[in-house]
Amino acid sequence: MGRDTRSRSRSAGRRGRRRQSQSGSRSRSRSHGRRNRRRREDEGRRRRRRRSRERRSDSEEERWQRSGMRSRSPPRPKWHSRDGSSQSDSGEEQSRGQWARRRRRARSWSPSSSASSSASPGRSQSPRAAAAALSQQQSLQERLRLREERKQQEELMKAFETPEEKRARRLAKKEAKERKKREKMGWGEEYMGYTNTDNPFGDNNLLGTFIWNKALEKKGISHLEEKELKERNKRIQEDNRLELQKVKQLRLEREREKAMREQELEMLQREKEAEHFKTWEEQEDNFHLQQAKLRSKIRIRDGRAKPIDLLAKYISAEDDDLAVEMHEPYTFLNGLTVADMEDLLEDIQVYMELEQGKNADFWRDMTTITEDEISKLRKLEASGKGPGERREGVNASVSSDVQSVFKGKTYNQLQVIFQGIEGKIRAGGPNLDMGYWESLLQQLRAHMARARLRERHQDVLRQKLYKLKQEQGVESEPLFPILKQEPQSPSRSLEPEDAAPTPPGPSSEGGPAEAEVDGATPTEGDGDGDGEGEGEGEAVLMEEDLIQQSLDDYDAGRYSPRLLTAHELPLDAHVLEPDEDLQRLQLSRQQLQVTGDASESAEDIFFRRAKEGMGQDEAQFSVEMPLTGKAYLWADKYRPRKPRFFNRVHTGFEWNKYNQTHYDFDNPPPKIVQGYKFNIFYPDLIDKRSTPEYFLEACADNKDFAILRFHAGPPYEDIAFKIVNREWEYSHRHGFRCQFANGIFQLWFHFKRYRYRR
């Protein structure tokens, strides 16, 4: 039993080993068959490649022969086998190659080719052209050789590459083709690396063309073929590309225009800043001028005034209607030293720069006079030290005569003398003492400046006197009276040379006296004659005036006032009823009886009450809005009048998030209007029981503002103001007040503040 089982197991084992050996031999035979089949496929592939290379080489040789390059055949490529077992081809291939070479040789040595080759030297024009053709042929051969080598390397690389490398090469080639296609389609760089398998859109057909059949059917072009659709899409893409270019060009043009506008705005801003800077400079100069005047006032008040302070006070008194200076400005130089006058010249220059030419003539004349006084003082100092070594232009004996000639002359007369001296200096001459005449000219300039200041001082005094008489109601003569000129007799007419006396010469001793006599005698005669004529005219005129005045007083000698009509009243006249006048009189008597300031009127009390509690953030607000076309029924009984008012506007800073971010307490934000306080004065209301009212109306021209109108009743007209249109705060805790007491209507309110809440 055990023997049978062992024999069965052995036989089963032998059968199993036999099956395994058979299966192993079958597998080995299958693998060997696959290897042989692969080898045969490779050999067939290599054979096809050799044939294709031979065909390409034959075609290239034929092209060489056609181009005339038969002297040298192109190099034959040496093709290598992949396995490297044998370097020679089969007999059939060798015979085919020999036959091809024989055929090419026969073609190359044909009579036509020899004739063309023999005729080609005859066609060559020059050795230089032949050398150029030879170099061109050599460069062409070099390019062909390089291309053949590159092709050989590519073929060799393809022959030895593995299937994975081949697959990678084809994929790279395909990707390059797709990339070129995407570039042609106008894809950007960010979408250039997307593929069907690698894209963030999850689209497996990303690179494929999407065909929207429904849209094509709707457009009626579903019958078109794929090629026609592609052409149509290309045209659409080209149109889109052109449109994008136009849009880009327009965008660039807009950016250019924007840059130009910004540049223009910058230039305008610079001009505004320049104007602002100019205004700031003017304000700064004005500030320094005011400070200089303030310092002058302080020094004058403390009794330590400088000459420039007195001159500044004099020139500022010309603009003042009440201040009067009785002395000429050059009298302030009396008693000054040379150092004081030099300081005065510097101060005058400062005032001329600060005033910017306002009183340039005055300061220029004062400079001339000061320089003349300085030169005189220096001459005195030099003469006090010892005898002068050089001649001073005018002799001391002649100087007094010159001063007497210049003294008492008007500015116009001195100007005539000045022109005559200048003409004499320009004319010149051999016996002309130039130093004398130049010194005389310098003195004459100082006398002209004094005469101009004297005439200006007289004009200012005359104008001040005229204004004072007008204010006091005193009748006076006109400021510029019309003088009646009487015809002069021939005996009293002056000759031209006597009208302008000539100053004495440097060498004449009796010249000054003669000139003075010649110039003074006719003048005195004329003066006497004029005085007599004027005295007679004034006497006649005064008598006529007295007679006319007495007649007027006789006609107007009434002690009761004349009754006036309504048309004769001025527009701003206030008409009072007898009862109202009596009431005012009694009120005035009561005010005199009570203790206190009797001169304080009801309006003063009103303004004093209205100004109480006025803070720093409040300012007076008196801009009234005109009301036109308003007619009152009581206008025929009472004369309408405007009420008095004292309004205040409350301004302040609003520290919201924006202002807290961009401003601080040192650089605060701009102030805004936060409220108003209206105080309207109605002391003479006819109906004391009617309370004044206010009406808030919309502003027609601007929605940001509103019209606040107050209505009280006779005899007061309505009054309106333009305010900011914001919501009011009606709570008394926030300062709202609307009351009428003691003839004063008060309306105080603040605007609501909108706070940011999350």
From Swiss-Prot:
Family statement drawn from the similarity comment of this UniProt entry: Belongs to the CACTIN family.
Positions where Phosphoserine occurs in the chain: S126, S476
Keywords from the UniProt entry: Coiled coil, Cytoplasm, Developmental protein, Immunity, Innate immunity, Isopeptide bond, mRNA processing, mRNA splicing, Nucleus, Phosphoprotein, Spliceosome, Ubl conjugation
Gene that specifies this protein: CACTIN
Protein name: Splicing factor Cactin
InterPro entries in UniProt: Cactin_C (IPR019134), Cactin_central (IPR018816)
Modified-residue entries (Phosphotyrosine), positions: Y559
Record cross-link Glycyl lysine isopeptide (Lys-Gly) (interchain with G-Cter in SUMO2), residues: K469, K484
Highest taxon above the source species: Eukaryota
Molecular functions (GO terms): RNA binding
Gene Ontology annotations for the cellular component aspect, listed alphabetically: catalytic step 2 spliceosome; cytoplasm; cytosol; nuclear speck; nucleoplasm; nucleus; spliceosomal complex
Species classification: Eukaryota, Metazoa, Chordata, Craniata, Vertebrata
Assembly description: Interacts (via N-terminal domain) with NFKBIL1; the interaction occurs in a pro-inflammatory-independent manner. Does not interact with RELA NF-kappa-B subunit. Identified in the spliceosome C complex. Interacts with SF3B1. Interacts with SDE2. Interacts with SRRM2. Interacts with DHX8. Interacts with isoform 2 of TRIM39 (via domain B box-type).
